[in-house]
Structures are given as C-alpha cells and as structure tokens.
Amino acid sequence: MMMMSLNSKQAFSMPHGGSLHVEPKYSALHSTSPGSSAPIAPSASSPSSSSNAGGGGGGGGGGGGGGGRSSSSSSSGSSGGGGSEAMRRACLPTPPSNIFGGLDESLLARAEALAAVDIVSQSKSHHHHPPHHSPFKPDATYHTMNTIPCTSAASSSSVPISHPSALAGTHHHHHHHHHHHHQPHQALEGELLEHLSPGLALGAMAGPDGAVVSTPAHAPHMATMNPMHQAALSMAHAHGLPSHMGCMSDVDADPRDLEAFAERFKQRRIKLGVTQADVGSALANLKIPGVGSLSQSTICRFESLTLSHNNMIALKPILQAWLEEAEKSHREKLTKPELFNGAEKKRKRTSIAAPEKRSLEAYFAIQPRPSSEKIAAIAEKLDLKKNVVRVWFCNQRQKQKRMKYSAGI
C-alpha cells in the first residue's frame, strides 16, 4: 500500500496501470476459518482509490491532512466491505462432509439390500453411543442393530457395523454436523429396520434385566425367505429350539433325496407284503398329532412322485415313521414266530388222492351218516385225519341233496 506519511510533504503517488490492493486492517473479520482468508472484493477498493487520488492532489500541510483522512476512510471502507463479505460467507452452510449425501436412492437401496443378505450375530457386546452422536433412537432395536454384523455376498468379508450410518459409507458423523446431513440416514433407518425385522427375532433375545442380548443364530438369506418360513423360525426360537429344527433341512428339501426315499419306501413295502391301502389306514395307528388315515391314491402318488413338493416334504417323515414301525414288527415276528404263526397262517386246501376217494365213496354207499367211532376207524385205515373224513362225508351228503333236487325239477 503506497501512501505518503503524515509528516512528509510529498504528494501521494500511485503507479500507472496498476490496481490498488488494500491490506485489511483486521484480518480476523476477513476469514471464516483459521486456515482460510477471504480476498477483498474489488468493489470495496475502488472507492478508496478515488478518494486517495483526490487526497493526493492537494499540497502542503493541508494536503497531507487530506491524504491522511483519505487513507483512514479507505481503511474503514475496505474493512466494512470485508466485514460484509465475511458475514455473507459465515451465513453460508459449511460444505457437507458427507460425500455420499448426493447419491441417488437406488444406490442406497442396493447397498442396504447387499448388507442385509447374510446376517450372523457374532458379537455380544453393546456399543453405547451418546444421544447427540446418533440420529437413531437409543432403544432395544438400535442396540440390536449395532451388534449385528453384515456380510457382503460379493466380497464375502464380514464387517461388523458399530454405527448404523456405516451402511452409507465408512465416514463418521460428528455432533457439529447440520441436521440435513442426518436426513438420508433417518430414511435409511426405516428401510434397514424393514430388512432386519425377521432377524431381530432370531439374533436377539430379552435378557433378565430387560436388555437385548444378541445370540448366535444361523439365518441364511433372510431377505429371500418367505413369511411362513420366517414365522416357523421365530416360533422355533420362541420355544428354545435350534434353528435347524424350526425350518426344513436341505436334505429333506432336495428332490433327489425325496425320489430316493420314495423308491426305497416302495421296495420295503412290497417286501413286507403290505398294500398301499394298508399303509394309508395304518398311519392312524401311529398316534401322530394331526395325522389320520390316508387314502390309497395318496400313497400311490407319493411313490410315483406326482404329489406337490410341499406335500412330499410333509409326508416323508410320516411314512418314514410308519416304515420304521413296520420293520420293527417284522423283525419281532422273525425272532418269535410261534407268537404270530397260529393266527396268521392260512389253512391249505385238502386234496384227497383217487384211491382214498374211492374207498370213501364205498363207505358212503353203505352208510351215509357214520358215527364218530366209524369215522375215526375209516380215517385210521386210510391214513387220513379224522376231521378230513368227517368233512368229506358232510360234503358228500350235500352233493347228493343237490343231485336229487336237480333231478326232481
């Protein structure tokens, strides 16, 4: 800054063709932060240059005084212009430090869906945050979300979420940020809770003091599970059962395993000598809750794999239980045949040879109604059973009656 001294008699001189740069008197008013300074606007310096030029035209002591007043007014004018510029810059919002704030909603939704694919609770410690540090409500849901790590399906690397805003990026929110920085994460809270609501029933159980305790539970592909499967899982965990008891196992749901079991069941049933209708009626004897007798067509459709997949899965454990009971009874019959042969053994048809038959006809011609002693003697002579001889004489009398009746007509 070039101006004459108050004690000198030289006129104020200004270089031709050069612009005047006024040094700010109070530099603190011209900067918004310790590391940045605001330049002085050209509009603030142009009145000062004209004033200084006028002051430099005078000579003598009066001219020196005029120059001094012009310099003072120039400084005050530039200070006023710089102050207004500083106030204008201070009123502007700080540039957002959230570099992901401008992303579209589709990218956020895709990031949320990717993070909620595989949810496995591995940490039992709570990360407590002060109320001003987090946009979420400090309730049980919040603590449960903090203890659930999300595994990315693309990278297969587990990253535990210590803050809910980590899904939108890996940066941290500080308490001096503006409220509009937290608005995307408040919208993210609702969508994330919607994705994680089935997992809360699996990975969190209420402790004795009312706090939510994260428990390790397997919940694969929660985003793609149907509501009935999730309800079955929730019911299983409510009763204290492991997760694999409340859902269908992969072995039961495999069509190849169902086909192999149906073929094995059919072969075992044929070997045991049991019909499909017998199997359907015997299911009621198993005393399984909610299971009664089934029709023969249902068993036939199971063996031919024409039932629906869900019905095949539901019917497999029932038929497997019946097959185990049937094979157990069959083994008992083999070990103790005397307990079962008397009632189940079918009597063979009696066949009498021709010589014995002619002798019986001769005895019948002499005495159609022999006494019991006579029947015993004939049986002993012909080497036949007494009951066989008695039945033959009875049948022969019925035959003679039919012949007489047909001859009389």
Swiss-Prot record:
Cited InterPro entries: HD, Homeobox_CS, Homeodomain-like_sf, Lambda_DNA-bd_dom_sf, POU, POU_dom, POU_domain_TF
Biased composition (Low complexity): 31-52, 153-166
Cellular component aspect of the GO annotation: chromatin; cytoplasm; euchromatin; nuclear speck; nucleoplasm; nucleus; transcription regulator complex
GO BP terms: axon extension; axon guidance; cellular response to cytokine stimulus; cellular response to estradiol stimulus; cellular response to insulin stimulus; dorsal root ganglion development; estrogen receptor signaling pathway; heart development
Domain POU-specific: 250-327
Region (Disordered): 26-93, 153-188
Cell compartments where the protein resides: Nucleus; Nucleus speckle; Cytoplasm
Chief place of localization: nucleus
Stretches the record annotates as Required for transcriptional activation: 91-237
Record family assignment: Belongs to the POU transcription factor family. Class-4 subfamily.
Domain free text: The N-terminal transcriptional activation region is sufficient to induce transcriptional activity.
Protein known as: POU domain, class 4, transcription factor 2
Species of provenance: Homo sapiens
